[in-house]
Structures are given as structure tokens and as C-alpha cells.
């Protein structure tokens, strides 16, 4: 991108950015500067100010907040099949947790990415905010859903609730989340009609995110610790 600087006594006093000859003339005081060139050219700008590149630039040049391991998927490999093959899915399609998406998800909370939210049964694995964000991306959550997912995980990962027992029993047991208050209205969650989530993204994905954390972080997979027959 054309950039002209005016320097006096070793210090910059003015600059002209972009392809616009009148600005060049004003800066230099030279009439007809570049007269053999077009007066202006549209779309001449730095990609660093392109709004569509914000997430990519934050990932590449911002402070690295992510500690999770990275997994490369080859160009010839279907990423959906790759995630399912690695056991990250509950059987339904999932959203690839790219660095950009996980960073965007973390914008939904002010809690540090490395804060331990809970020790997740049945394998009793410490789970950070970042790990919850990864699974929220997989589930299809929006960033504004993350606080509810975090609260739900804290609610079930304690001795009183006994999530380990829920996951290890042979009976067909599954937790139900009840969300109420201003955040329920802010997220547009179903209430009164369709409370079991059909067609509502918040209702569908918040519970799914919790289930994926229990599965992917806590290790509760059918046929392993999860012995439910229904």
C-alpha cells in the first residue's frame, strides 16, 4: 500500500496512506506529483485493517492464550470424519474447534482460559475454561452461551450431584439443566413451549456442550465407564 511520510529534523510530522494523488500533492507540496498515474485506486488498503481477518490476526499475532494440543488434519482428510474417528463426537456432526473459533468462544467469558473449572468424572480430570470452550465449539455454541456451560459444569461436578454415579450406572439416567433468569431471556432459550430444546440453538447446544465435556474430558464413553443399557 503506498505510504508517504514527511519527516522534519528526523521526526515524522505527516503521512499520506493509500492511493490518492491529491493527498500526495498536499503532503509534498508538489503539484502534478505522479500525474502519469491514476488519480486514485479503490480497495487499496492493508489486510491488517480488514474486519474479516480479525480472528486470524489475533490468532497469529496476539498473546497466545491457548494451551491445548494442536492436531493437524491433512488436506485429503475429511475433518468431520477425522473428529468422529478420534471420538470427539456424540454421534452427530460437530464443529471443528479451530484456534480462531476457540479464541472467539473465550470472548464469551472474563474468566482466565487456564482457570480450572471443575474436576470432571468419571476419570477425575481437571478441566480448564479453555477445554470447556473447545467442547462448546464442538457442540455448536455461541460465545454468549459459555457462561451457562461453565455454570452447568460446576453444578454437576461435585459430590452432592454425583456425576460419576450418573455416568457409571447401567440405568438410563441423564441430567436435565434448568436455566432461568435474565440470561435465559438474553439467550432466547425456549421456556413454556419447546422446553426440551427442539429447534432452539441455545437449548440444544448448551446441554450438548456439557455432555461433550463429560465425554471428552471426563472420559465417559458408552461401553467404557458409561455402562448404561438404554
Regions found by a protein language model. Give the residues of each.
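Non-transmembrane, aqueous-exposed alpha-helical and coiled segments at domain scale
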Residues: 61-230
